[in-house]
Design a protein with these regions (language model features):
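Conserved RNase H-like, two-metal-ion catalytic cores of nucleic-acid enzymes
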Residues: 1-90
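Short alpha-helical "patches" and their helix-cap loops
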Residues: 38, 100, 145-148
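Conserved structured core elements
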Residues: 40, 59, 90-93, 123-133
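Charged catalytic and DNA/RNA-contacting regions of genome-maintenance
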Residues: 66, 77-101, 108, 133, ...
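Mixed-charge, glycine-rich, non-catalytic linkers/tails in nucleic-acid processing enzymes
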Residues: 74, 114-148
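A short, charged helix-loop
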Residues: 98-120
Length: 148
């Protein structure tokens, strides 16, 4: 089963979100992330037999995807946010921006969320996937050290 790191960019927090701009993802068969824009394609993607891995996906991504696209939470998922808090308790900051600094993958700065181009949303989303891919590799390594 493919371990698949993903992220989505939307138009707001859970109380106002009504649009998904892009879903980007990477699995172990890919060198670079790919992106999906079409709502039907996004729905089909989350029906695939994969392990879906993301940062804060339980608290935001899947609730937002459910609200906008009626996407059900997959059976197999890993949220790297609480996992990082548990396995890296002394870190202090658990946002992808800080991890991006650690891994040499800068998180793009956004000043105007409402007027980005599709390319801007995609670049940000794919950058988050690259950062989270590195984080997932670290977390998986720590889990293997603990549990073999």
């Amino acid at each position: 089963m493919l371990e698949t790191v993903f992220d989505c960019e939307t138009n707001g927090l859970l109380d106002v979100v009504d649009r998904v701009h892009v879903v980007s993802y990477k699995d172990e068969t890919m060198r670079e992330p790919e992106s999906i824009y079409d709502y039907e394609d996004i729905k089909e993607f989350f029906k695939q037999d994969r392990i879906f891995i993301g940062h804060h996906i339980i608290g935001y991504d899947f609730p937002a995807l459910a609200k906008v696209l009626q996407v059900s939470k997959p059976k197999r998922l890993v949220d790297t946010y609480p996992l990082a808090v548990t396995l890296m308790p002394k870190r202090g900051s658990y946002g992808l921006e800080g991890f991006g600094v650690d891994y040499g993958v800068p998180k793009p700065v956004v000043k105007d969320w409402e007027n980005l181009t599709r390319e801007d949303y995609t670049f940000r989303c794919e950058s988050d996937v690259k950062i989270n891919w590195c984080l997932w590799e670290d977390l998986r390594r720590k889990l293997m050290e603990l549990y073999g």
